[in-house]
Regions:
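Short beta-strand/loop motif that positions the catalytic acidic residue
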Residues: 191, 197-199
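Conserved alpha/beta-hydrolase catalytic His-Asp/Glu region
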Residues: 121-127, 134-192
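Conserved HGGG/HGGXW glycine-rich cap/lid loop of the alpha/beta-hydrolase fold
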Residues: 7-55
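Gly/Ala-rich beta-loop-alpha elbow adjacent to hydrolase catalytic centers
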Residues: 88, 92, 96
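Flexible "cap/lid" loop of the alpha/beta hydrolase fold
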Residues: 97-102, 108-139
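Acidic catalytic loop of the alpha/beta-hydrolase fold
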Residues: 202-206
Length: 252
């Protein structure tokens, strides 16, 4: 397992098997987090860092969501493995859904994890960019005690985690501010791939009804909730998360 450059975009990769692409959330790349290593036991996993995040360049070329989709389309096509299984978390979930809608030939199965991308008047999302660290931890985690361990999971250098995160958030505002709604709801019906909508029950950033809204708009989708988890079920409930993903990707 290693990290390697993909042009200007850093990519974590590991494992062998069916190709699996993982798109991370708005705060930071997960590095070699435990859930990625577990997925790499049965899949050839690639987890690119979003352009402009951490050590990856290329953000200046992204004018809108369409440019993001084209960036990932190029990465998948350069991989040369045919359609991939695609997992997107948080903001990465929004981008994964866009890819599946606009490039359906590239996606075999789709997993959306606590995904952004919709706006529900009855269930508004808080603005994570103005929340205090304590408020953000309470919103993100079922057990806020996980917040103290998060940099060790998500950042290669915990001492630099706050600086890296600040820069990442500045980039995320392009797609999430004032709200993370760029018209995705109109495109979700064009997704052909079987879709699993995974959602941590205690998520205080993306309320649980958003999961049902995704499933209503995607033709072949179902919802699975994960108790004891908030916005990061792959961290708080790693084994439950990986088990749910594996059952969906390899049914039978």
């Amino acid at each position: 397992m290693n990290e390697r450059g993909q042009g200007e975009q850093r990519v974590w990769e590991g494992g062998k098997g069916a190709p699996l692409l993982y798109l991370h959330g708005f705060e930071q790349h997960p590095g070699g987090a435990g859930f990625l290593r577990l997925l790499a036991e049965n899949h050839a996993v690639r987890a690119p860092e979003f352009p402009g995040y951490g050590e990856s360049g290329g953000f200046e070329r992204l004018r809108d969501v369409t440019d993001v989709v084209l960036t990932y389309r190029r990465l998948i096509e350069d991989w040369g493995v045919g359609p991939v299984d695609l997992i997107g978390h948080c903001l990465g979930g929004m981008f994964a859904a866009e890819i599946a809608a606009l490039c359906p030939h590239l996606v075999r199965r789709l997993v959306l994890v606590n995904a952004y991308g919709l706006w529900l008047d009855a269930h508004p999302m808080p603005d994570p960019f103005v929340m205090t660290p304590d408020a953000l931890a309470k919103a993100k985690f079922h057990d806020p005690g996980w917040a103290a361990r998060e940099p060790n999971v998500f950042a290669g250098s915990p001492a630099d985690a706050a600086i890296v995160r600040t820069g990442n958030l500045a980039i995320a505002t392009k797609f999430m501010w004032p709200v993370a709604d760029r018209g995705l709801a109109r495109r979700l019906p064009f997704i052909h791939a079987p879709t699993l909508v995974l959602h941590g029950v205690s998520d205080g950033l993306v309320p649980l009804p958003h999961a049902a809204a995704f499933a209503r708009l995607i033709p072949d989708a179902r919802v699975q909730t994960i108790a004891g988890a908030g916005h990061l079920p792959m961290v708080e409930t790693e084994e439950k998360f990986v088990s749910a993903v594996e059952r969906f990707l390899t049914p039978g």
